[in-house]
């Protein structure tokens, strides 16, 4: 089979609906942050972890960590994100933080994973990744 035909078959198999199903099965949320514009998009699972909904404007955790990230984790989080974006790494970013649900006093442990897309000058222009709720694991560890 020609390579182009295989590629088109894979594109039909891996539809956005199926990818969303896989993320739901893994209990993971997906985000896309356009670093140039500052605009961030979250899947419903990310919004649920944050205690937000589609009806309200959810904060960008990368530019406004003080709104959702535990105060003891904010500096660490911002530092690790900056280090990753400045480092030109091909290794995915992985940061474990405590995230507060908006309008609530409840906290969850979340692992924020991401990969940067870079321009021709190797500057980060986009960060794409998933959030994983790791509260059960962290509770067992503590």
Could you say what each language-model-derived stretch is?
Residues 1-6, 122-134:
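PAS-family sensory domains
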Residues 6-18, 126, 138-142:
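Sensory-domain boundary/capping and coupling elements
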Residues 14-66, 109-111:
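PAS-family sensory domain signal
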Residues 17, 79-80:
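Generic recognition of well-ordered alpha-helical segments
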Residues 39-40, 107, 124, 131:
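Hydrophobic "anchor" residues
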Residues 72, 76, 85-115, 123-125:
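Per-ARNT-Sim (PAS) sensory domains and their PAS-associated C-terminal
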Residues 72, 134-135:
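PAS/PAC or PAS-like capping segment
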